[in-house]
Amino acid sequence: MLPTSLKTLVLLGALLTGPLGPAGGQDAPSLPREVQRYDGWFNNLKYHQRGAAGSQLRRLVPANYADGVYQALQEPLLPNARLLSDAVSKGKAGLPSAHNRTVLGLFFGYHVLSDLVSVETPGCPAEFLNIYIPRGDPVFDPDKRGNVVLPFQRSRWDRSTGQSPSNPRDLTNQVTGWLDGSAIYGSSHSWSDTLRSFSGGQLASGPDPAFPRNSQNSLLMWMAPDPATGQGGPQGLYAFGAQRGNREPFLQALGLLWFRYHNLCAKRLAQEHPHWGDEELFQHARKRVIATYQNIALYQWLPSFLQKTPPEYSGYRPFMDPSISPEFVAASEQFLSTMVPPGVYMRNSSCHFREFPKEGSSSSPALRVCNNYWIRENPSLKTAQDVDQLLLGMASQISELEDRIVIEDLRDYWPGPDRYSRTDYVASSIQSGRDMGLPSYSQALQALGLEPPKNWSALNPKVDPQVLEATAALYNQDLSRLELFLGGLLESHGDPGPLFSNIILDQFVRLRDGDRYWFENTRNGLFSKEEIAEIRNTTLRDVLVAVSNVDPSALQPNVFFWQEGAPCPQPQQLTTEGLPQCVPVTVIDYFEGSGAGYGVTLLAVCCFPVVSLIIAWVVARFRNRERKMLLKKGKESLKKQTASDGVPAMEWPGPKESSYPVTVQLLPDRSLKVLDKRLTVLRTIQLQPTQQVNLILSSSHGRRTLLLKIPKEYDLVLMFNSEEDRDAFVQLLQDLCVCSTPGLRIAEMDEKELLRKAVTKQQRAGILEIFFRQLFAQVLDINQADAGTLPLDSSQQVREALTCELSRAEFADSLGLKPQDMFVESMFSLADKDGNGYISFREFLDILVVFMKGSPQDKSRLMFTMYDLDGNGFLSKEEFFTMMRSFIEISNNCLSKDQLAEVVESMFRESGFQDKEELTWEDFHFMLRDHDSDLRFTQLCVKGGAGGTGDIFKQSNACRVSFLTRTPGNRVMAPSPRLYTEALQEKMQRGFLAQKLKQFKRFVENYRRHIVCVTIFSAICAGLFADRAYYYGFASPPTDIEETTYVGIILSRGTAASISFMFSYILLTMCRNLITFLRETFLNRYIPFDAAVDFHRWIAMAAVVLAVVHSLGHAVNVYIFSVSPLSLMTCVFPSVFVNDGSKLPPKYYWWFFETVPGMTGVLLLLVLAIMYVFASHHFRRHSFRGFWLTHHLYVVLYALIIIHGSYALIQLPSFHIYFLVPAIIYVGDKLVSLSRKKVEISVVKVELLPSGVTYLQFQRPKTFEYKSGQWVRIACLSLGTNEYHPFTLTSAPHEDTLSLHIRAVGPWTTRLREIYSPPVGGTSARYPKLYLDGPFGEGHQEWHKFEVSVLVGGGIGVTPFASILKDLVFKSSMGTQMLCKKIYFIWVTRTQRQFEWLADIIREVEENGSRDLVSVHIYITQLAEKFDLRTTMLYICERHFQKVLNRSLFTGLRSVTHFGRPPFELFLDSLQEVHPQVHKIGVFSCGPPGMTKNVEKACQLINRQDRAHFVHHYENF
């Protein structure tokens, strides 16, 4: 009786293995209660994994590693493996076996080993113990290159081992460690199912029932290429249970033998038990075949191999460990290798030995071993009879002598790994022993209780002493270093030596006694005693006879020996003579034939942007054609609107500017007018009777162009539709000039030359600008470097330009005024001494000298002379009135005629001249007595020293100018204490380094928030890159990819992490609603939300650069992967590749186009090329719709990115980690935007204001609620319904309509200005409608929470305050109770021209502010070094005008205009004196960061005092 615990274990094993019932017969259950598993599990019920496939080898002797853990011993600790192979195993073939062992017994031994052990599978991560071939090796290095290295990849090991010296590395056995027929049925259930036919209990056969079917992809047969022919693939390889069962036809024949024997047993069982099903038949046949196999291997082959009989079987020993030892692997395989002959005979049952053809006319007596490795469709083994003849031939052939010699077929021509077709079997076995950490020969003897030899000569007396001497020399005469494998070979002669014999016998005994399913174990219930006896009497000869039907007399009784008198002796002991030569080693170039295709593929990918550019160019051409058609229609409609004598043409303004349509009118008064398409006069040319007019006609390019050269003017270049149109215009011009004395001179030249000779407006302006600078340099002693230099071009056109004179229009433009202004008329009349209607440069210089260097008396006299219109030496009231009127014209006519008369009277009365009707120059100068210092412009100096720019209009620091207030009687009062408002002047730094430093400081100052955000974002991206780069470079678990493509994987994975982050968080820059909300929070102080679009572009550009680097990294990876062997690729990509021995890696095109990451990567590059090209500024200008449509490919982009990373080729998908949160936010933001309906908004009013500003007033939707200072996005239906642009609202929340002031600075705003030109009929019906989206942005809403608020606007940053000021005035006029009692509004701007459009808004604020709630100051920072004559010459008038009328001459406003920068610190300090009872003052600034920083700094300095606290809120534009 079994113990209770053992019964329990047996029952557990039965449940786990699954008892099988009868398949459908009427017999009693035919299967035993337990069927042996295929994978070796649960053979031992206590130690379930013992002997299972994948279990580790069990050492007999402690491991011998270099580090005691896993590092193999290598040179120089041990000799070179190839040298050892040459020294120990080299020799001639042809010596017969000492005991006449047959070749059949030899290859049966190999078959048994394939059933027991398989450690050839390379391990992962890949580690190499390469074999370095000595220079000049006759086989592997015949060219004496000295760089030949045969790769040897270490075998697969148990990952739980190799951790410490107490747990060294152990290899794993890939097959079951039991003698259970796994070489016949496979080592797993799935493998066995693939081999079965599931019909009649048989194994599946091919077209010929005597052969199994060919190997299939689902069956992991080893498919190494034929080293002789290079042929590969599964075709011609049979499906066996042993993975390497097709290595040689001789091993293949034994596999076929057992295949046929199983099917024979199944047929017999089916005849005996016709009611059994397939499973019963298969399992009973398998059981019988395994038992027969065990019997032959242990009781027939092993004694013949060892010349020892194993001990009698004493029953199953459950505590016996049958695990295969690495020492057994080395001993058995290496000893068998000494017996392999160079060829194998084939014969029939009549003892006829076959001949085989070879090169030439001769024949070969045998199959050459070296040329039959992994051979496909062997012509000598086509039929079952051929297989039988091979088996009979092996039974008659005597193997090689069991000694140290290994024939060259193995030693020099063994199938090689990777790129090499051949390798050294012995050297590979030596490396394999070192890989397994085998002990030395002496250590193994001592561990097994055997006596080690004392010296080299005592090792084996039968070995040639020269061999021992050579071996000893390689080991430095140290016998203790001799390795187990070589020592075992040297001790063997005729039989295995004592070491190998003990190891092999011990292994087989443990396998038998520890196997619960051993056929002699009567307790397992597999066989009865009679069946066991029958099996014990079955021999391999019986199996051969049964499956081949040969005459038993054709075989000796024991086919493992050939004795004298046995049938069919071999013709001779085979040598290499008479056999075909072994095919030499070849080196495979994996990339051969792929270079051109790989290059073309990369070139095609690089051409994606080029193709996208071509597409964009085609789209742009179509858009330009449409634009030309529109222009053509416009010209046709323009013809109908122009006068009858108008001639349509295109004016060419210059070489880098686009031509535009004009209409040229020739008027009877000999004037020529050029009008634009809106009939606005662009230019008027007065043809004087005495002028010589030159007309140059083009003689090429259709003869459509003409050049009109008028003296003292820049040239006019016109391009007509045809030569006929041009000739018609020439005729009209000739008719106009017929009465002129000089007449019209006409010439012809080539069009290119004509355009080159033309003096354009831009050229004229450039020459005049430089000349003006030279004049000022002479007048003001300005440094020549600051003034600029004259052009060095001495061509005729430059000389003509320098000698020309200024027209009235050019003179007005130089002053920044209109030609029809009275001031221009007076000044021009005064300067034009010769009265020819032009001012020469000398005449201009005379005026300039007085203004710049003259004394106050000279300047007042010049002004007096200017307005002494009748020249009588007196300035009448009427002339004084005219002078004041000219000033008022400059200031936008802010005063009526009556108001101006009142001002003149008050000025006369204030000076004591109320009774005079005329003023002498002395009276006039007395009237300007208070402005003597202002008239001293002689202090204008830009040399940079004391008295430089900082002295312009210099005021005493002690002077304080108040915000002037008006009393009900219109008298001016100055409340005390007063505010300090004088402008601060800055000195210019002239040094190059100082200027660069200042520029850098200003840049950092202006973009500090941007820099911080970009730095943080870049740091995160760099950190992600560094993390992945470090991980794959140093810290990743060994996967071989970092060893295979170190640079490529670092670049590709590092950039992939950064790109994933960038493409994820770039979505946040497009969440407008979220940005609008966050701008109203404290985060706006730290994050420049207004720069979201710029940040979007920056991220996109950085991402595409990294994408290119990522692609380059993968280009390197693809090349390296294409030249790496399959064994290495299996380690790198275990989920993609299976190492089946085929060696050849996938080609480059597989990586590019047949993998998900490759194909999606190519598509991603294509999408990116399209999106980025169409998003360029140039193309957006030509076709915004194309940009908009292609940018919607971002949906495809993200889909491809997700698919690209989901394949997990290198690592698990990680894009979702970055993408999920931004995507949810972005989708939510989009849903909010989609919830707003697009309503067409009608435009109510349009005004074209100066400085290119367009005023739009449009309907306000009923549900539109906003705060003053917010902005909206509008789309003009005529310019595209999807193209939105943001603008700040300048209307107040209480107004019924919305308004915008849009400055034309880009293509869209320019086109908008053209489209909204005032219609002819004066109605708004023809105005295109708008789409409105918003409001967005932050409103400065806390101004009303302070009793005193200061609003500071810089440049265009004043626009939010326009809405706030109007809102403020409305609330105050409505009597709304507000905490705020006083508003100070300061606007800092470069030049007065920038605020012309805002004057009406500020004037409205001033007129409606009944309680003087708002005080306005304007600071103009542009100084006279810019040579703005108007700023210089009108300064005196501004101060006097402000004093007399309490209005600015420049703006017509009560606000004071200053020149320079506001003194924020002094102003805020004085504000505390004006409002001593106020304890908290709000400061709101909006503009460039430099200005808001100065305000912030001033507030911080003032807040250090124990007085009023200034709370600063700012917003940067």
Curated annotation (Swiss-Prot):
PTM summary: N-glycosylated.
Side Extracellular, residues: 26-599, 1032-1046, 1122-1154, 1207
EC number(s) reported in the record: 1.11.1.-, 1.6.3.1
Subcellular location: Apical cell membrane; Cell junction
GO biological process, one term: cytokine-mediated signaling pathway
UniProt pathway annotation: Hormone biosynthesis; thyroid hormone biosynthesis
Function text: Generates hydrogen peroxide which is required for the activity of thyroid peroxidase/TPO and lactoperoxidase/LPO. Plays a role in thyroid hormones synthesis and lactoperoxidase-mediated antimicrobial defense at the surface of mucosa. May have its own peroxidase activity through its N-terminal peroxidase-like domain.
UniProt protein name: Dual oxidase 2
